Amino acid sequence: MDKIATRRLPKIAALGMTTMTLLLGAGPGSAADDLYGTLKKINDSNTVIIGHREASSPFSYVDDHKKPVGYAMDLCAKIVDEIKAVLKKPGLTVTYVAVNPQNRIPMVMNHAVDLECGSTTNTLGRQKQVEFSSVYFTTGTRVLARKSQKAAEIEDFNGKSVGVIAGSTNERAVKAMMTAGSLKDIRIVEIKDYAEGLSAVEGNRVDAFVTDDIVLFGLIAKSSQKADLVVVGRLLTYDPYGIMMRRDDSAFRLVVNAALAAVYRSGEINRIYAKWFDPIGVPLSPIMKAGFELQALPE
């Protein structure tokens, strides 16, 4: 445990008791005195700021009505409900701010967003800057290409161009394979976001686009050229997704994980999952089912 968290321990314990009394209808006066960090920020501003992606289907994207929607957004809505209950503020304002792979971590660290609800992998390196909720999805790196490439694995793109999002776990995986010598003469093309990656493959500007396979399935589902596209190859990485938040804020993390645990415990996660993944033909895997059960912590 870090020094900051150690100093906060008495207040964290107090907040745990305060949370229960708030939910039971006790007066809010003493509760406000115990708040700190993100909960205090939200309480004082009467606003929770949600960071969302613009084209990370089916997790977090902007629909035809310019509304942020998706699997991660539905889970974050449950978290917002929990925050409202804890703070006894049912009229809490929710503000949405678009983020991208390049600015999502700085936006969280700089208090521009309180929760990043997208498709962000929880890594040990990122935990040096931010914190994550319990895992709500697991995926891994694979390859999107045109069927005409007749590729089976990423090694089939030796001597060709491969698009990657700068700073992503997928980029690191490809570059590690290049360093190891299993990928040779590949030309790396930096891609801004998922939408650009799809467009680059559709327009033959790159031979392949490498990112999380579940995102690739979502991109194909929305493509006008879906019959010509395919996801190929083995999983190159293991990528557990989490809701991103600021570090050293155990009280807020507890509220976030309590909300997710309730969704897992009640079985509501099955309905939410089916809503977003059944349409793209991705059933709930045994690994994900076990993950939800393991994280369905009792109150």
Describe the residue ranges of each PLM region:
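Bilobed "Venus flytrap"/periplasmic-binding protein-like clamshell domains
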Residues: 49, 55-58, 68-85, 121, ...
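Acidic, polar ligand-binding/catalytic clefts
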Residues: 77, 88-156, 296-298
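Periplasmic-binding protein-like
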Residues: 54, 137-145, 213, 221-260, ...
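Extended ligand-binding regions for polar small-molecule ligands
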Residues: 33, 39, 74-82, 155, ...
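Extracytoplasmic small-molecule ligand-binding "clamshell" domains
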Residues: 32-116, 266
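A ligand-binding cleft/hinge motif common to bilobed small-molecule-binding domains
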Residues: 103, 117-129, 173-181, 200-203, ...
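Short beta-strand-to-loop elements that line the ligand-binding cleft
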Residues: 87-100, 184-193, 233
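Ligand-binding clefts/hinges and TM-proximal coupling segments of bilobed small-molecule sensing domains
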Residues: 32-33, 169-189, 227-229, 261-299
